[in-house]
Amino acid sequence: MKSLLILFAIVAVVAAFPELERERRGVIAAPALAAVPLAPTIALAAPKVAPAIALAPAPKLLAAPAVVAAPGPWKAW
């Protein structure tokens, strides 16, 4: 049910604005970025950020799934 609500919200946002208005607001960012003269600068800056994110250590909670398990008679939601 949540996924249906999210899908409806996305369709409503896309249908609410004409195409040029969506580009101006950034809802469809790819055509708008292609027209901006700074697009090559943005494209070159992205790979510098990506390796830092890839090298970040994973949180400890993700490595221990037993912490998430429900104890005893409790229901796991």
Swiss-Prot record:
Expression (tissue specificity): Expressed in the epidermis, hypopharyngeal glands, fat body, trachea, esophagus and stomach.
Record's note on what induces expression: Expression is increased following microbial infection by A.apis and P.larvae.
Secreted among keywords: yes
Signal sequence region: 1-16
Keywords assigned: Antibiotic, Antimicrobial, Immunity, Innate immunity, Secreted, Signal
Source taxon at top rank: Eukaryota
GO BP, one annotated term: antibacterial innate immune response
GO molecular function, one term: carbohydrate binding
Physiological role: Antimicrobial peptide that binds cell wall carbohydrates of microbial symbionts and induces structural damage. Binds the cell wall carbohydrates mannan, N-acetyl-D-glucosamine and lipopolysaccharide. Can target fungi, Gram-negative and Gram-positive bacteria.
Name of the protein described by the UniProt record: Apidermin 2
